[in-house]
Every structure is written in C-alpha cells, then in structure tokens.
C-alpha cells in the first residue's frame, strides 16, 4: 500500500481529505524505477475543479501511454491544508506516488483563467521551486505552462521555463525526447531550454527581451539568443479523430464539477463572436468522426460507470452529424440508464425534442445566450442570434411544458448604450409575454420564471475587441443598475429575476488578460501578501491587489480603460494563433460599423487559419476577401 | 432478488465518506456489468441501501450493503466481477441471497464489534485487562455525548454489550449497539474508560476497526447476535 504524504491527523482535520489521497479508479500507477520521465500535471485550482477539466484528462492519458513516462496529477491545496503545509514544512506532492513535485522532471500547469495566477505561485512555493525561472537549476522540474492563458503568457512570463502555445497532442513527444537526449549528454538547463525554444509552438520567455516606449507601450520584442524564432506559431492537431482520447478517464471519489463522461465532439467554432477568445484561438473548427465518438461513448461509460454523458464543444449545434450521434446516445444510454446532458445547444425543435427525451421537463430550464440586449449590439458582437429566433425557440418550449428560462448577457460591450441595456429587460419581458400568449391559463403551472444574468465584459487578446477600452468599475455598476431599473419597469417584472456579477474581479481579470511582463512583480507581491484562490469570491482580496499595484507604480488603467492604437504592438503579438492581426482589425472595424460577418460554414472570411490546411478550411465555400 | 454484500474498507479508503462510498459502488456495479434493478420514474437509480455508515478515519472488515438484482449467476461470480472493479483498500468478501421478506440492511443492524488499537506514541499505560473488566463491571455507565441539540447525559451500559482488553495485543474489543435507535460510537465508550481512570483522552490516539456488523437472530428479551449476512444464503 502507498504511503500518504499527509499524516492521518492532517487528513482527519482538513475539509474533503479525498482531494489529496489519489487512488481513484483509472488513476495510473507505474514503477518509478522503470520510467525515464516523471511528469506532474497541474490544474492550479481545487481538486473538484481541476478534475473536471478535459484537457488534463487527454494529456494524462497521452503521457501515460508512453512507456518511458509516468504522468501524475497535482491540484491546489485548499487554504485549510495550505496553512498546515506551510506550518509543518510539508512539500507539495503528486496524487499518485505522493512524492514531492520538486523531484519530478516536468511540472506542467494548465492555465485556464487569469484569476488563477497566484495559485500558480502557491504551487511553486509549496513545491519549493524558486518563483523565477532564471533562479532554477537541474534540481527543479522544467515548469511548462499551457492552455488559453498561454496565448498571453507575459504577465506570468518570469515564472515559467517554457510555455506551450496550442494543443498539447503534437509537441510533447519531441520535447520529452529532447529532454532525455539533453540529460544523457549532460547539457546545462539553459542549453536544454535553448534547444526547446527551437521546437514548434514552444516559447521560452527568458530568451526574449522587451523594450518600451515612453508612453509605456511596447517598442520591440526580440529573441536574445540566435536561432530561436521571433514569432511562435500555435500547435494544433490537424485530424482530431486520429488523435488519442482517454478511454479510461480517472473517476474521482468525491463529487466534482464535471461528474460525467465528457465526449469532445469538435474543436473550434465557426461562429466568430467578436468577444470570444476561444472562437478565435481554436480555429479552424475540426470535427471528430461520429462513428469513433460512438465507440468512445460506450467504452468510456463501461470503463467509468458514470451515470451521465455530456457532449463538449463550443457550439454543439454546429456539429454536422449531431442528430445521428445524439439519437445513438439516446438509444444506448436508455438501455444503460445513463443521462445525457447537452450544453451549448441552440434551442430549436430538434434540441427540444432531444431534451424531452433525456431530461425531466419539469425540472430543467432553457438557456439562451443572446449576450446583448438589442439587435444593434448583437450585430456589433457578431452574435448571430436574433430576437425572432429566441422567441420562436421559447414559444416552442413553452408549448412543450417548459416554464423556466435562463438568459445570459454581457454588460460593458463596445459601443453599448442605455438603449441596448434596456433591450435586456425588454427581451426578458417579451419572453415572459410569449409564455402567457402560448400557454392557456388552465395549463399554467404558476408564473413563468425568467432569470436574466449579466457578466461584465473583459476584452481578451486575439479577439477583434482586443483594441477596446474596458469599462471602469463605476461604469459597470451603473450599467447593472440601469439593467435592474429597466427590468423593474417591465409589465412582467415579477416573472423576471435579475443577477449580476461582482465588478472588482472583472476589472482585475481585465488587467491580467491584456497585461505585459511588468505585471510579474505585482502578481508575485500580491501572492506574498497572501492572495490565493482569487477566482473564489470569498478569497479574492481586491484591496490587497489595489495596494500592490500602487506600490509597484503601476497605473492599471493602462491595461483596462485605455484606448489602444491600431498600430500598437501588443504583448502577445509574437504569438501567431492562425488568425491574423489584419483580420482581427477588419473585424474590429466591422464591429464599429455594426456589420455582421458570416460564419465559417457559410463563407470563408480569410481569417488566416486556412494555412493549417485542416477542418472547415478544407471544405469548398465562397471566399470573402 | 435481494443480495446482501459484505465488504472491507482499509487504507486510504478511510478518508472516503459514506456518501462517496455509495457513489463509488454505484459506478463499480455499472463497470462490473451487474444486472442491478433500477427504480422506475424519470430519473431511475439503483436499488441499493447501506447498513451502517462508517465514520471517517475508521477501517472495517464488516461493511454491508443490500442491492436488488434482476438476474445472477453465482456468489463467486458476483464477488469476482465486483472485486475486479475495486480500488486498493476495498474488497468484496461475500454476497448472499436474502429471503424475500428480509428487513433491509439498515433496519436489521443491532450491533457492531470494534477492535480499538492505539497509535504509536499514544498508547495508554493505564489500560489493563483488570481496568477494563472493572469498567465493564459497573452497573451503570453515565456518559455525556454531543448531539445536534447540545449535550445529553445517559446510561451507556444497556448499549454496551461487551468490552474486553487484550493485554498481549494491547487492543480493546467492544460490542456496542449500532441500531439506528441506540447507536454508540466506539470512541465514546473508550473515552468513558479514560475518564474513569482520570486519563486524558485524545480521539486521535484510537485506531478503530469495525470487525463485524450484527443483526439480532434471537428475541428482544434474549438477543442472539449474528453477522448481518446470517439470514442470507450462498447461491449458484
């Protein structure tokens, strides 16, 4: 039996000890003496969040298929354990072997959202790995970051040896081989990193120098070592049907956020919503073959025993063989008494029919994400959802017995006016109206329940809105009050509930999202002052962050509310995600002109991703130049 | 057909709580391809019930759950199929077919036997066979326990069926009421021994293993404790 890193008295004292003991069904144990590479895969948040992430499951499976590699998992210790580990000087450990992270060859950290940056420092700190990459020697694992936030790695550049830009399936094998070769040759760590920096998609920040203009924008960004590229092109899998997928995902003991089999049906999105980073980063859209998905579904259900399966993609309705796949799942899942959950489905007669078959209509609610209240603003953000489509979907659903609707909007979008904001209330009211028009009195089960939620818009790199000024906290809150007042004025206001997010964290996210290397210092200082779990409202300490930026002499409005020039060099411009800056610029202009751009299935808009020669880009369509 | 399944729980499984063990078994049964019965209705779930929740940190050689199956081959087949799906620390020990009129596992529980060992460095020097015999020989044992509503004081003696110390092994054996009406935590009994001997009690010192869970095969007046699987029979 394995020896646990934590003693019984600690495990009996902390909340949910199952977070730290490993031993889950399908977790992989290997003999450490028979592998060459120990890889610790980290999601820098609590176990239940980290275990729900599909990307890690894919990479965990991929690494453990390599005979020479043992990949283990590590998550952020919750604050209760965090303080015990500090007090008793217990090093952070991996779940499978329970051995210290510092003894590993690699520490891979997936960076899914900006608000986890201090948790990355917590992981390094508890592992006793120096914060700064340049202070590390061969006693430390190679710290490598990936995931969506690696597309602007600059605010955390000092803390990583390498960033992997793009999809993990392609370059890890060459990187591991290079590592083995370098170890054999007795290379220095620096020599290894120089050679790694020459692999496609890999960015080694310490070999790049940034200079700034007087106005604080970037003057130049150049490699300091010869032979390494000035531009890093993202890696991607051209045929995603042909790549590895976990047939035996780890099944946690405790209930996690994603407590089901997850089937990734496609990567990328054809839609091109202008606020959406994923929609640009993961282009072009590539589908997995439906027949192999059917096989995966059965195998994964058999190997895990899960009671539910979910389809994962940015916009499932756009998957070309959705109907066939879903009908197959309904049939086989019914036999197995398995539920199907279908997020990101457009509400139409097909999806309603499916939902009626797989869900309890009385309990479930409909979800629409119009994102903006008026058609004008929906054109600005290129969200191709019209009021007509929403009302049609809602009417169909009401006739089918549904009486709960969730609506998601954003506040603070570029060009937004009070008129657009009132549109949120008016649309909510019209949906309520549609219910009372559709469902006769005697068939009504109480009032229709409409929940409208707004989040605050944060401009992200590699979107057409990367040039847009973000709102201030005061503007955000004013917009939320305007929404609230407008809803109160509606005829059916009693049927509409309004929720809005807290504004401080959105401002913070905005600073980090479009930040540069100069933010490394305040992030480290904020961590040293005790900031961790910033993504968790109860732990987020806005006052500490504000104070820290001031101490570091950083004017945060430079990163948030500033109007960026069209010719400005952005901190992330050295990354080539496929979509060109010229395309994003033309989309930014289209947004300001309230002009809609067609989706990738209707026509090619020459975004630049076609050069990868895969997915939708290889399907003949009209090209709009 | 109702089955009573006995299993053990050791090692790191001590840190998996009762509800998570239930969830674990629901999935294991699916993986093992056992033809379990489901409730009818819109969200069907497995017909499954557990005898007595085991506290966090405790090990066990005598856990039970009842499940209903639509078909079955044999006890060994069932045990092997389910054991093939177990993680380290949890083993299926027996599976017995219950008579149709059997009370469910939880309602059947009358008592449980525990072995209490002591963690290194926390061994109580005062404990001897004689001390424990003297404790158990009392006509009443007044204890105070914390409940949701506050504290209650009661006589534990009627709920404490056996209590003995093994000098050689340095372990205590306890048989206590484990029914839903009169459940006694083993640590409460051990604390009473410490208290009587004016020794400072620390919960953490105890390494507790539930050895067996019993039903009452006798009468109310003349009880006869038998393992919970007693009323079932091997099949196939």
Q: Model-derived features: where do they sit?
A:
Chain B
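Ordered, amphipathic secondary-structure segments that act as subunit-interaction surfaces
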Residues: 61-115
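Helix N-cap motif at beta-to-alpha junctions
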Residues: 71-75, 121-123, 179
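Short amphipathic alpha-helices in soluble, non-transmembrane regions
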Residues: 77-86, 127-136, 189-190
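Extended, well-folded interaction surfaces typified by the phenylalanyl-tRNA synthetase beta subunit core
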Residues: 6-8, 12, 16, 20
């Amino acid at each position: 039996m394995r020896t646990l890193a934590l003693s019984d008295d600690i495990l009996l004292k902390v909340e949910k000890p199952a977070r730290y003991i490993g031993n889950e069904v399908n977790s992989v144990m290997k003999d450490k003496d028979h592998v060459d590479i120990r890889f610790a895969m980290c999601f820098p948040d609590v176990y239940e969040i980290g275990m729900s992430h599909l990307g890690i499951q894919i990479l965990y499976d991929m690494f453990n298929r390599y005979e020479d590699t043992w990949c283990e998992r590590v998550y952020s210790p919750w604050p209760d354990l965090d303080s015990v580990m500090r007090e008793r000087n217990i090093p952070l450990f991996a779940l499978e072997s329970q051995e210290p992270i510092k003894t590993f060859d690699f520490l891979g950290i997936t960076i899914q959202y900006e608000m986890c940056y201090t948790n990355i420092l917590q992981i390094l700190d508890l592992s006793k790995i120096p914060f700064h990459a340049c202070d590390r020697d061969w006693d430390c694992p190679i710290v490598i970051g990936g995931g969506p936030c690696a597309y602007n790695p600059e605010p955390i550049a000092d803390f990583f040896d390498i960033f992997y830009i793009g999809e993990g399936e392609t370059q890890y094998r060459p990187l591991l081989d290079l590592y083995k070769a370098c170890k054999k040759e007795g290379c220095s760590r620096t020599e290894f990193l120089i050679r790694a920096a020459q692999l496609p998609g890999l960015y080694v920040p310490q070999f790049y120098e940034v200079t700034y203009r007087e106005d604080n924008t970037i003057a130049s960004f150049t490699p300091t070592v010869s032979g390494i590229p000035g531009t890093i092109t993202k890696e991607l899998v051209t045929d995603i049907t042909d790549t590895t997928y976990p047939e035996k995902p780890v099944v946690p003991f405790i209930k996690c956020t994603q407590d089901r089999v997850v089937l990734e049906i496609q990567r990328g999105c054809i839609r091109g919503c202008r606020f959406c980073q994923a929609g640009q980063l993961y282009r072009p859209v590539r589908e997995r073959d439906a027949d192999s998905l059917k096989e995966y579904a059965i195998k994964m259900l058999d190997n895990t025993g899960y009671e539910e399966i979910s389809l994962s993609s940015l916009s499932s309705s756009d998957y070309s063989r959705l109907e066939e796949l879903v009908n197959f799942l309904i049939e086989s899942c019914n036999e197995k008494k398995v539920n199907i959950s279908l997020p990101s489905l457009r509400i139409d007669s097909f999806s309603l029919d499916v939902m009626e078959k797989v869900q309890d209509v009385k309990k479930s609610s409909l979800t629409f994400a119009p994102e903006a209240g008026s058609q004008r603003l929906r054109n600005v953000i290129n969200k191709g959802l019209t009021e007509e489509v929403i009302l049609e979907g809602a009417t169909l659903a009401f006739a089918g017995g549904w009486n709960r609707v969730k609506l998601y909007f954003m506040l603070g979008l570029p060009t937004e006016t009070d008129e657009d904001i009132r549109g949120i209330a008016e649309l909510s009211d019209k949906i309520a109206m549609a219910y009372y028009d559709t469902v006769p009195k005697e068939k009504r089960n109480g009032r229709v329940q409409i929940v409208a939620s707004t989040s605050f818009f944060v401009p992200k790199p590699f979107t057409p809105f990367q040039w847009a000024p973000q709102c201030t906290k005061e503007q955000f809150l004013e917009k939320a009050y305007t929404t609230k007042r407008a809803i109160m004025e509606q005829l059916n206001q009693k049927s509409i509930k309004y929720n809005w997010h807290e504004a401080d964290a959105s401002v913070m996210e905005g600073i980090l999202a479009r930040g540069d290397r100069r933010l490394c210092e305040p992030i480290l200082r904020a961590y040293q002052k005790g900031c961790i779990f910033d993504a968790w409202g109860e732990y987020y300490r806005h006052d500490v962050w504000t104070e820290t930026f001031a101490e570091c002499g950083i004017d945060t409005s430079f990163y948030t509310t500033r109007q960026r020039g069209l010719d400005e060099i952005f901190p992330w411009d050295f990354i080539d995600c496929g979509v060109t800056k010229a395309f994003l610029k033309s989309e930014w202009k289209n947004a300001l002109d309230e002009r809609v751009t067609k989706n990738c299935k209707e026509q090619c808009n020459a975004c630049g991703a076609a050069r990868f020669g895969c997915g939708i880009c290889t399907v003949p369509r009209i090209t709009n130049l | 057909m109702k089955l009573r399944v006995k299993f053990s729980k050791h090692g790191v499984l001590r840190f998996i709580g009762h509800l998570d063990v239930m969830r674990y078994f629901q999935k294991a049964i699916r993986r093992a391809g056992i033809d379990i019965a489901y409730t009818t209705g819109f969200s069907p779930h497995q017909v499954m019930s557990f005898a007595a929740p085991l506290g966090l940190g405790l090990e066990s050689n005598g856990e039970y759950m009842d499940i209903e199956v639509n078909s079955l081959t044999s006890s060994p087949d069932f045990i092997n199929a389910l054991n093939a799906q177990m993680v380290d620390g949890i083993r299926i020990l027996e599976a017995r077919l219950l008579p149709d009129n059997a009370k469910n596992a939880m309602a059947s529980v009358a008592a449980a036997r525990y072995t209490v060992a002591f963690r290194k460095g926390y061994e109580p020097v005062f404990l001897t066979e004689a001390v424990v015999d003297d404790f158990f020989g009392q006509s009443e044992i007044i204890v105070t326990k914390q409940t949701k509503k506050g504290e209650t004081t009661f006589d534990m003696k009627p709920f404490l069926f056996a209590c003995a110390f093994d000098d050689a092994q340095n372990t205590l054996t306890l048989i206590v009421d484990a029914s839903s009406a009169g459940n006694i935590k083993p640590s409460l009994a051990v604390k009473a021994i410490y208290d009587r001997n004016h020794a400072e009690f620390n919960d953490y010192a105890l390494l507790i293993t539930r050895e067996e869970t019993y039903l009452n095969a006798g009468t109310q007046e003349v009880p006869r404790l038998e393992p919970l699987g007693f009323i079932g029979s091997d099949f196939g």
